[in-house]
């Protein structure tokens, strides 16, 4: 009887200890300040004619009206333990800032992970996406990248993106060893993160708006930003003015600057340290799927970029996660079950560069 009692007490102690550790891990966030602002963009010239305030919105011609367009929208959070190294986050294609804030299975996203480590978060919706939907040049149907050109009929893409993002061969299956959250609910939440452009994507306008975001962060904090990009956002990131960037962390960017190009030289001259991360299922992905070859080309291009960048006096690290023992990650490593492990690796890299 005594043995059973001791076993019960021990089990209860372990349960309570586990709960305490869980509570400690999920301690309340201490945020000193949070808010939103817009940055960049333009104001269109007035529509031909005179504005009549008596009819205002009833006048379908919109005569005399202007529009504020092509800006970025920023949600920011500043922790009480702010370490002076803010992070600006830029989403990829079909995404918004939501992807940095949570995971499909409801865990804390990278924005919160780094916030707990003292990095203020500046979460961007680029022009024409999310809460920055106003664009000067709208497509004829308003959603050119996901709607058919000749009608309002929606062009579905769940399965295509699932395969291309290397989550599995065909939804809902996952590749062996996958870190993507399991279950129908998590998959449903992931697909519902996808959001369209409100018009034609313009990389130059997006980069200009992000440059203004960086300038605003510098003005507000007095510090340059760590720039964390993903996928299509990586392509935008290489074009953003460098004067307010402390470092770039590119998560599977769609490409890297051509060696010797204006992009390349601008980054090199500014001595911007760069870390580029790639997940799994690239070298070991199905050869009959076109996306496997695409990601190999992108990864190999990044390795070539890093080799030249470093030889020219720059500082670029390409992290191939399987090669350092972190396996099972798709294109969305920051939303997967081992996302904290990868974030810790990034934090270590930032520390090596005096940025934490």
Report residues per predicted region.
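Gly/Ala-rich beta-loop-alpha elbow adjacent to hydrolase catalytic centers
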Residues: 228-237
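The feature captures the conserved acid-bearing segment of alpha/beta-hydrolase catalytic domains
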Residues: 250-321
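Active-site glycine-rich loops that stabilize anionic/oxyanionic intermediates
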Residues: 91-103, 254
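Conserved acidic catalytic loop of the alpha/beta-hydrolase fold
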Residues: 204-225
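Conserved alpha/beta-hydrolase
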Residues: 107-133
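Catalytic active-site module of serine/aspartate enzymes centered on a nucleophile-bearing elbow/loop
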Residues: 328, 332-356
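Short beta-strand element of the alpha/beta-hydrolase
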Residues: 84-92
């Amino acid at each position: 009887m005594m043995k059973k009692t001791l076993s019960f007490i021990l089990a209860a102690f372990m349960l309570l200890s586990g709960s305490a550790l869980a509570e400690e891990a999920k301690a309340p966030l201490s945020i000193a300040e949070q808010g939103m602002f817009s940055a960049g963009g333009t104001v269109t010239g007035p529509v031909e004619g005179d504005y009549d305030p008596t009819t205002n919105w009833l006048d379908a011609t919109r005569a005399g009206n202007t529009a504020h367009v092509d800006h970025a929208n920023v949600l920011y959070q500043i922790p009480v333990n702010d370490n002076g190294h803010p992070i600006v986050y830029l989403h990829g294609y079909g995404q918004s800032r939501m992807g940095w804030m949570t995971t499909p299975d409801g865990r804390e996203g990278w924005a919160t992970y780094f916030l707990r480590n003292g990095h203020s978060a500046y979460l961007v919706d680029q022009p024409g996406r999310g809460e920055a939907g106003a664009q000067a040049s709208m497509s004829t149907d308003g959603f050119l990248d996901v709607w058919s050109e000749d009608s309002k009929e929606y062009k579905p893409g769940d399965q295509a993106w699932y395969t291309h993002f290397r989550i599995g061969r065909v939804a809902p299956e996952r590749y062996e060893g996958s870190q993507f959250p399991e279950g129908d609910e998590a998959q449903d939440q992931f697909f519902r993160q996808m959001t369209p452009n409100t018009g034609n994507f313009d990389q130059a306008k997006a980069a200009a708006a992000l440059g203004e975001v960086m300038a605003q962060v510098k003005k507000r904090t007095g510090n340059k930003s760590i720039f964390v990009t993903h996928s299509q956002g990586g392509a935008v990131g290489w074009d953003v003015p460098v004067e307010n960037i402390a470092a770039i962390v590119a998560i599977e960017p769609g490409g890297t600057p051509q060696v010797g190009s204006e992009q390349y030289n601008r980054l090199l001259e500014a001595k911007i340290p760069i870390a580029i991360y790639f997940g799994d299922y690239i070298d070991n992905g199905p050869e009959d799927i076109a996306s496997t070859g695409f990601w190999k080309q992108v990864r190999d291009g990044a390795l070539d970029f890093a080799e030249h960048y470093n030889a020219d006096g720059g500082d670029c690290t390409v992290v191939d996660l399987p090669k350092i023992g972190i396996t099972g990650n798709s294109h969305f490593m920051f939303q997967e079950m081992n996302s904290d492990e990868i974030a810790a690796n990034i934090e270590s890299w930032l520390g090596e560069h005096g940025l934490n």
